[in-house]
């Protein structure tokens, strides 16, 4: 049987809890989390202004580092990060003023002067009052979405157990809106942490390969935001029993997000399926990949004058196997499959209604629909500081 895990960013009432802070184990994990956050959210700095991004990175690393190493487990979440930023008052006319967060870092520096969070915070404090205020405004704008109480609650603790997906059969559903990208950064964070956690576990615990293959079916891949270093991940995860299937409406979507790395990502995919479409870039590249076929041409000619003459001409020419206009009007029941080491071939799409397990799906009958709210309501949820009794039962002596 499969374990069921669900992260639903459309309706948080139908979602389990996901806390990215629960998967921080080292300083590099903190940096990866900050990189993903910045890549998929918007601050107040001018687009392309590297200064604000680097300044925010320093502050986030300092605050998250403090929370990870010094705060109680129940306070290691985004809600605490928001409280830190809200408490960081800056007075432009008083450079000597210290806010509560400054005092906390001063106390930490006195105890642990080489602490990761202290070193990052001291670099941030090099900014003058007006600049520091601008950095805080940008951070506040980037994290404004966490003013929503539901989001703070769903990220307060973790139930997804991402690092265990390669240990036993698990079905993880990441549900996001296809019209609103406000919370898509959570999905991107989840994928980033999932890939990194599973790769590290495969190397450190299982000698290079996970015992249970993890297959990621990433539908609407372009809508989840950017997964940092995806071009490197797709090249290395396969050896660790992890595979990724990226589903796109057009290749241009991938290039819009990953720029020059889009070609590297596509090149590292062993299999690609064209289901149809009319986006020019996709059609042009596919037509080139399909190559050419040889055709025989037969020309006849007739010249009339005083005398009539006839001519015959046979010729072999190269023609695109399928031109762009032919690909654009390809039969909806057909697809083109490209496998590594095999020439592309035209195939029929599988009729899912003929699958022997189709009768178990919600498409076959509404009674098969999985009620996630009912599933979650039957699970015991422990809240921070909640008092409960623990009973030890010895079943061996019974």
Question: Where on the chain are the PLM-derived regions?
Answer:
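P-loop NTPase motor domains
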Residues: 1-242, 257, 262, 325-349, ...
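Conserved ATP-driven motor cores of ASCE-family P-loop NTPases powering translocation/secretion/packaging/pilus
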Residues: 234-336
């Amino acid at each position: 049987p499969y374990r069921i895990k669900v992260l639903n960013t459309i309706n948080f009432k139908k979602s389990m809890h996901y806390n990215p802070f629960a998967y921080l184990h080292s300083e590099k994990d903190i940096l990866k989390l900050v990189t993903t956050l910045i890549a998929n959210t918007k601050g107040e700095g001018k687009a392309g202004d590297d200064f604000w991004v680097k300044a925010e990175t320093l502050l986030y690393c300092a605050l998250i580092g403090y929370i990870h190493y010094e705060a109680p487990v129940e306070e290691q979440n985004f809600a605490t990060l928001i409280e830190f930023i809200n408490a960081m008052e800056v007075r432009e006319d008083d450079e000597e003023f210290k806010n509560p967060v400054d005092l906390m870092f001063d106390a930490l520096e006195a105890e642990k002067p080489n602490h990761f969070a202290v070193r990052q915070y001291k670099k941030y404090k090099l900014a003058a009052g007006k600049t520091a205020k601008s950095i805080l405004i940008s951070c506040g704008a980037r994290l404004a979405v966490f003013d929503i109480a539901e989001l703070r609650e769903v990220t307060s603790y973790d139930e997804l157990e991402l690092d265990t997906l390669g240990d036993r059969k698990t079905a993880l559903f990441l549900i996001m809106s296809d019209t609103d990208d406000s919370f898509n950064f959570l999905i991107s964070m989840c994928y980033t942490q999932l890939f990194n956690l599973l790769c590290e576990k495969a190397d450190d615990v299982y000698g290079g390969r996970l015992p249970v293959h993890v297959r990621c079916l990433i539908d609407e891949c372009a809508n989840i935001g950017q997964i940092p270093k995806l071009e490197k991940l797709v090249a290395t995860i396969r050896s660790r029993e992890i595979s990724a299937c990226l589903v796109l409406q057009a290749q241009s979507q991938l290039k819009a997000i990953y720029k020059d790395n889009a070609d590297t990502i596509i090149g590292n995919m062993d299999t690609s399926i064209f289901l149809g479409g009319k986006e020019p870039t996709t059609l042009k590249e596919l037509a080139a990949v399909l190559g050419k076929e040889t055709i025989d041409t037969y020309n006849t000619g007739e010249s009339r004058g005083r005398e009539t003459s006839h001519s015959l001409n046979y010729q072999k020419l190269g023609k695109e196997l399928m031109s762009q206009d032919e690909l654009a009007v390809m039969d909806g029941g057909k697809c083109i499959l490209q496998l590594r080491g095999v020439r592309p071939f035209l195939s029929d799409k599988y009729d899912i209604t003929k699958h022997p397990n189709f009768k178990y799906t919600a498409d076959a009958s509404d009674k098969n629909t999985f009620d996630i709210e009912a599933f979650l309501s039957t699970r015991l949820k422990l809240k921070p500081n909640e008092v409960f009794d623990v009973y030890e039962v010895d079943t061996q002596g019974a």
